[in-house]
Amino acid sequence: MNSRIMILMLTGLLCVPAGAVEIEGVKLADTATVAGRDLVLNGAGLRKRLLFDVYVASLYLPAKISAAAAVLAAEPRRVEIHMLRKVGADDFLEALKNGIEANASQTERDAIQPQMSELAKVITAIGKTKEGDTITVDFVGGSTLVTFNGLEKTRIAGEQFNRALLNAWLGDHPVQSDLKKAMLGG
């Protein structure tokens, strides 16, 4: 093989972004733009339930952060969920509720009940997700923007709701410990 061609091929291989991440066939972008600000991929991991791979979750922040408490102070922030299988709306909502309940007091849960009702309506309207669907949750200016496959579904006001939802993944009792660690870059 011609040495010039070999050099060009090797150079091309070296130009692949070092931060490019692929999990279970899902290629994650190194950056995302939320509210006009560039965010970096902080970390990503695989959500499992029993023996099944359910989704890939990724966290985007203004800068890399490894402490959950510091993530809650960062703004804007994004959680992106790439579905790997069919999941019913009730099952998805139940998992989120369990994550929130495990990390919030009864008083905190009571305070965000109207926002939880709004989220439940949206998830119910989305219905059963399938492999390849993407749910994006942006946290901006005290509100939570939920999109499904690129289409805005709702904007839910309230910083307390915003934090409670993020804590389902990153709180002291996350839905899955190794997913939390992965989203925090570990």
PLM ranges: what are they?
Residues 21-73:
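N-terminal structural module
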Residues 148-151:
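Short strand-turn-strand beta-turns centered on an Asx-Gly dipeptide
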Residues 178-186:
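Cysteine/selenocysteine-centered motifs that mediate thiol-based redox chemistry or coordinate metal-sulfur cofactors
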Residues 64-141:
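Mid-length scaffold segments of soluble, non-membrane domains
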Residues 1-7:
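Bacterial N-terminal signal peptides that target proteins for export
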Residues 153-179:
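Flexible glycine-rich active-site/ligand-binding loops centered on an Asp-His dyad
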Residues 16-20:
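Sec/Tat signal peptide C-region and signal peptidase I cleavage site
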Residues 7-15:
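Bacterial N-terminal signal peptides
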